[in-house]
Swiss-Prot record:
Gene name, Swiss-Prot/TrEMBL: CATHB1
Record-level GO BP terms: antimicrobial humoral immune response mediated by antimicrobial peptide; defense response to Gram-negative bacterium; defense response to Gram-positive bacterium; innate immune response
Function: Has potent antimicrobial activity against Gram-positive and Gram-negative bacteria (in vitro). May play a role in the innate immune response.
TM region positions: none
Propeptide: 21-211
Entry protein name: Cathelicidin-B1
One MF annotation (Gene Ontology) recorded for this entry: lipopolysaccharide binding
Amino acid sequence: MGRMWASEVLLLLLLGSSRAVTPGLDVSTAPGLDGSIPPGLDGSVSPGLDGSVSPGLDGSASPGLDGSVSPGLDGSASPGLDGSTPAGRDGTITPKLEGTITPKQDGSISPSWPWRWPITYLDAILAAVRLLNQKISGPCILRLREAQPRPGWVGTLQRRREVSFLVEDGPCPPGVDCRSCEPGALQHCVGTVSIEQQPTAELRCRPLRPQPIRNWWIRIWEWLNGIRKRLRQRSPFYVRGHLNVTSTPQP
């Protein structure tokens, strides 16, 4: 009786050890010859030894454990779950569908459209001087003498801004009759500049003459030259037109 009990216990131990040693079906996937791991039955891909995940058949890559997405073969990266796009290797940001530009890592913002570029006060005045030379009639070429700063230009959100500057008659070009020109004669121009998709300006200019000392010989000289002065005298004029604004290089 004791021997039969011992043999039954030994048989049970042998059966239990055989079940524990016998291997089941291996559901793990062995890597291929090139080191890549094919997807499992559910389409998921296990990460490699270095933690990287190979892209799928459509070229997309699943986010890593930290939520980051590696760029594709062309350097592009798919947007994240919140719609944002990570910065490229050079720090540039791809514009979104609505046209907005995200600042770069250094804080600067790339221009989206030319009419949204930052226009300085000097850029607007130089464009206004070019407009004057296009609109006025005569051989005289005006050039900028002084740009008078206007308060509220920097940081303002208004599209229409005030300008004030002085222009003078430049040297006479060779081969041109410039008898009606007075090199160095000043004119004071004021007006507004509209910063829009097509910038425009409304300017009013008037001659700026120095006030002479009222001595008797000055009065005689003015009387003798009165006719010549009246023939060459200029009247205030009004100019309105589109501006061709070009940004000046920043130092």
